[in-house]
Amino acid sequence: MLPTAVLLVLAVSVAARDNATCDGPCGLRFRQKLESGMRVVGGMSAEPGAWPWMVSLQIFMYHNNRRYHTCGGILLNSHWVLTAAHCFKNKKKVTDWRLIFGANEVVWGSNKPVKPPLQERFVEEIIIHEKYVSGLEINDIALIKITPPVPCGPFIGPGCLPQFKAGPPRAPQTCWVTGWGYLKEKGPRTSPTLQEARVALIDLELCNSTRWYNGRIRSTNVCAGYPRGKIDTCQGDSGGPLMCRDRAENTFVVVGITSWGVGCARAKRPGVYTSTWPYLNWIASKIGSNALQMVQLGTPPRPSTPAPPVRPPSVQTPVRPPWYFQRPPGPSQQPGSRPRPPAPPPAPPPPPPPPPPPPPPPPPPPQQVSAKPPQALSFAKRLQQLIEALKGTAFSSGRSYYETETTDLQELPAS
């Protein structure tokens, strides 16, 4: 019983840690009520926590310290929000913006701090796609860096992005849009409550036909709505998500970012979205490939990161024995093992001994040969001196052996 309780505590702590750092599963709804939204324009109010990755981008006015909702965004992790580039046409300074997380209702022109579980954050950096074309809304995508990082919780969680192998979203498919935008085309202001609605993906060729958008749709766009209109995103929904359910994972994947449209909910004028799939590499180049893989469904892409980490162990296999590093002699042995090429330095000492012996042998023989005659002569002379001493004609006793060897050499033949 005790081990089970311990395991439950550990599981809860791990889940809480992942939730706090936004490293947990992406695309999970905390409050699911999919049958509610049958009709943004034509939508219905969402339940609190239904879309935890929804972010409210609000312009901050310094003259009255009030915030005004302007665009939506998608939370990717504690540091990054994905949105549309055209949201920053008029306000490009980071100090002009505030980010509200976990909200279901937003107050237009509020000057009060948000209350938990909502979180308010500043903008550290705005990254607009380098090839964004205003007016034509080409490459209408941007990233916002959050400061300080926002923790995830019951009403705040990361959204999912498609896998690289997924390809662009294809019709027919029913997906979802959300936002605090206008409830009708010429509404007075944005909706105070988050709206949700079902929309159908529309084939790009049909959407680009002469009676629809007549060539204005690009391959990096997604069209969603209905031929008859009536349900659509509108002003104030820009930057928000177009989400399709992944039935295998039972999660939602953000396949598009609300970009533009002609009017709101008009017939044959569906909402136009920036497809997220063509920009996965761009997103990875800004937030990092590991951060991107954390918000991509499925295991195939994630093992691609463990695979490189496996290579480092393989690189370390030559020094795999741990004691090489843990013991002091170990490190010295390994550096010494590389100096095995310096083992020739010990070899050079052996070569010196052989050369010295050869030179000494040749010199000594000639020296010994030349020295023998003087030694023979000295011995003969000594013998002669001994004989002469016996005869009574001895040398003075004060001379050394060296002096005797160097004097009277001519007397040698007399012996």
Curated annotation (Swiss-Prot):
Residues 1-16 form the signal peptide. The active site is at H86, D140, S238. PROSITE patterns: TRYPSIN_DOM, TRYPSIN_HIS, TRYPSIN_SER. Residues 300-312, 328-367 have a biased composition (Pro residues). Glycans are attached at N19, N208. Residues 395-409 have a biased composition (Polar residues). Disulfide bonds join C22-C152, C26-C160, C71-C87, C175-C244, C207-C223, C234-C264. Keywords: Disulfide bond, Glycoprotein, Hydrolase, Protease, Serine protease, Signal, Zymogen. Residues 40-288 form the Peptidase S1 domain. One of its GO terms (cellular component) is acrosomal matrix. One of its GO terms (molecular function) is fucose binding. Residues 339-415 form a propeptide. PANTHER family: ACROSIN (PTHR24252:SF8), ACROSIN-RELATED (PTHR24252). Acrosin is the major protease of mammalian spermatozoa. It is a serine protease of trypsin-like cleavage specificity, it is synthesized in a zymogen form, proacrosin and stored in the acrosome. Heavy chain (catalytic) and a light chain linked by two disulfide bonds. Forms a heterodimer with SERPINA5. This is Acrosin. It comes from Sus scrofa (Pig).
